[in-house]
From Swiss-Prot:
Chain span(s) of sequence motif SCOOP motif: 52-66
Keywords noted in UniProt: Apoplast, Cell membrane, Cleavage on pair of basic residues, Membrane, Secreted, Signal
Family under the similarity heading: Belongs to the serine rich endogenous peptide (SCOOP) phytocytokine family.
The gene coding this protein: PROSCOOP23
Compartments, as annotated in UniProt: Cell membrane; Secreted, Extracellular space, Apoplast
Protein name: Serine rich endogenous peptide 23
Function: Brassicaceae-specific phytocytokine (plant endogenous peptide released into the apoplast) perceived by MIK2 in a BAK1/SERK3 and SERK4 coreceptors-dependent manner, that modulates various physiological and antimicrobial processes including growth prevention and reactive oxygen species (ROS) response regulation. Inhibits root growth.
Membrane recorded as keyword: yes
GO CC aspect terms: apoplast; plasma membrane
Gene Ontology molecular function: LRR domain binding; receptor serine/threonine kinase binding
Tissue spec. comment: Mostly expressed in roots, and, to a lower extent, in seedlings shoots.
Length: 74
């Protein structure tokens, strides 16, 4: 019985000390009207596609060995 009381007391203390920390750690989202540049920091699908195009393929031996399937373990 004493262990249960200690566990509940410890969890409640952690809960009450943890709540202000999570409140402070939240990301504050501003409305687009309040920002100076609307769209700044917004990543749309076009930006992701440009990044995918800019990144080349892998030149590693492991990547090429999977295409040939000569090694059943690789």
């Amino acid at each position: 019985m004493n262990k249960v009381v200690v566990y509940v007391l410890a969890l409640s203390i952690l809960l009450f000390f943890g709540l202000p920390n999570t409140t402070l750690a939240r990301v504050q989202y501003g409305s687009p009207v309040s920002r100076k540049e609307i769209g700044k920091g917004v990543w749309d699908q076009k930006v992701f596609n440009e990044i995918k195009i800019a990144v080349g393929g892998s030149d590693s031996v492991r990547a090429h060995s999977k295409d040939h399937k000569s090694n059943p373990n690789g």
